[in-house]
Amino acid sequence: VPGCNPLASPGTGLPGCVQQAITDAPLTSAKIDFVAPSFEWPESEVLNLTYTRDLSDTLQLEATYLWSKQEEALYKIVDGSPLVGDQPQVPTLTAPDGRPIYNQTGYRTYKAGLYNDCCGTREVFSLALSKSFNDGDGKFTVSYTNQNIDELSGMTSSTSNSNFGKTGAIDYNNRKAMRSIYETEHRLLAALSSTHYFLGEDSPTTFTLVFERKSGLPGYVTFDTFERTVGDYQSEAFGYDHNLNDDSSALLYIPTGVNDPIICWSRNCGDEGSPAAIARAEEVINLLHNVYGLSEYAGSIQPRGSFNYPWQSSLDFKITQVLPGFRADDEVIITLGIENLLNLID
């Protein structure tokens, strides 16, 4: 506001001109985060079962099963369309693949509310077998863990726009439970530790090796919806504001083949059937169907976790040396660790 000094009369609250400017500010040109009136603290149901048994004096078995169902807190955008209660509705305008197209018409002026939605589920099973030796100074453990986790959203950020759009979806406002981006379906672990007393009984030296072999994280393919021009939101970014479309995580429609009727292989469908368009189509179909293995989703929108990244292996080594301190009860602990010895071999 011209002539308004927000620092006038420090310690006495906001000057009147500042308060008036806030009152007069048009909400349509502001980014707004709010908590929906219907929001309640999310609830979870959890079942945890653990079984342990000593198979001998030196051999232990442990099995664990964890199941949970969790309501999630997630953001939904309000684009100016009528609400039912406090809930935004699904737009009637749809893309050729069936997903809704929203009608946001601002630039970095989205309105996002925090709502409840249900539900994600999680199943985790683990089995571990441990063998001690050398009078307890050595231990060998092998374990296997399996995860089956579905969630609505990964909630990957501290800001509403990133939480809204960073985790892949068909319709961000009406998410369906899909495979978690954090799921490790299979994990094998072997750990060997051995303690020795080269420097005396009060100065143990422990050597530890940990080998891990695990399946790759879930992956999925998305559209590039990065769009700054408001007039192109609906045609290029499913109607989302630039602050939301820049995450480009709209799950990709998988074409049936080079002749899929809802796909254009040239700009604005202006050069279909040309050698360049045909070559482009064949390259994309080969990538999606053969490289990523998504042919089973042809003619539909592939879900999150439609493929897995490669398995990973690691071998970590650590030496821990305990030394006496300056006082009777003091200890000095020195640790040397090498993360993934396999990198030194390969």
Model regions: which residues?
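Substrate-binding/catalytic groove segments of enzymes
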Residues: 198-201, 323-331, 342-346
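Surface-exposed cleft-lining segments at the edges of enzyme active sites
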Residues: 34, 175-176, 301-306
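Gly/Thr-rich phosphate-binding loop signature of adenosyl cofactor/nucleotide-binding cores
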Residues: 338-340
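Gram-negative outer-membrane beta-barrel transporters
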Residues: 62-221, 291
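Solvent-exposed loop/turn elements at secondary-structure boundaries
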Residues: 1-113, 118, 234-238, 242-249, ...
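Extracytoplasmic gating/loop element in the C-terminal half of outer-membrane beta-barrel translocons
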Residues: 20, 206-326, 333
